[in-house]
């Protein structure tokens, strides 16, 4: 019987680019500074919030903004299912990820501390964050009712989960 191939190139059930290194990596939790920096980066977040009392959960992609150590902000339609769920539950979660190897993610959950209109400067900054300067400017100009139709939910992060598959565990 032939010896096992090198663990880095050993065939796995994984497909795509991860199959080469899949078994040679470890999931390592990020420290507070790393998770803050990652969450502050530009990612589409997946917001989750409880719907009703039957244990159902709403999970939808959203734009968000976050400054390390501060509140996390999501912008949504004032009458949307997301807004209704966050109001009713009084809290929500958000997960962001890097979908390219080595994989990383940060998941955060906490209470809604404020619901308010997003001022025009912050609304433009969020549009530029996701669409670039020209695209953000055009998006805001083409949607003059954003200020009346949307609302910002601010969350204070309480519970964090994070993993970085590109780091080795410190032993």
Residue positions per predicted region:
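Short beta-strand segments
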Residues: 42-78, 86, 92-96, 105-108
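Extreme N-terminal basic, low-complexity initiation segments
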Residues: 1-5
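A generic secondary-structure signal marking the coil-to-beta-strand transition
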Residues: 35, 43, 70, 104, ...
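Short secondary-structure boundary segments
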Residues: 98-99, 157
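Short, basic/aromatic recognition patches
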Residues: 21-46
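Charged, gly/pro-rich active-site loop segments
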Residues: 6-29, 104-171
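Short, solvent-exposed aromatic-acidic interface loops
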Residues: 77-81, 130
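Short, surface-exposed beta-strand-loop junctions and turns on beta-sheet-rich folds
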Residues: 80-82, 101, 169-170
């Amino acid at each position: 019987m032939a010896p096992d191939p090198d663990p880095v190139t050993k065939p796995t059930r994984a497909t795509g680019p991860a199959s080469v290194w899949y078994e040679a990596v470890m999931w390592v939790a990020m420290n507070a500074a790393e998770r803050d920096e990652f969450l502050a980066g530009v990612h589409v977040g997946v917001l989750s919030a409880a719907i009703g009392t039957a244990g159902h959960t709403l999970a939808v992609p959203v734009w968000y903004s976050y400054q390390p150590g501060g509140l996390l902000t999501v912008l949504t339609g004032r009458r949307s299912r997301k807004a209704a769920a966050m109001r009713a539950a009084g809290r929500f979660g958000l997960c962001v990820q890097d979908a390219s190897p080595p994989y990383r993610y940060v998941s955060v959950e906490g209470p809604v501390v404020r619901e308010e209109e997003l001022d025009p400067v912050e609304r433009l900054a969020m549009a530029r964050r996701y669409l670039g300067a020209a695209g953000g400017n055009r998006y805001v100009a083409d949607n003059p009712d954003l200020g009346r139709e949307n609302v910002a939910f601010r969350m204070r992060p309480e519970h964090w989960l994070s993993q970085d598959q590109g780091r080795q565990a410190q032993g």
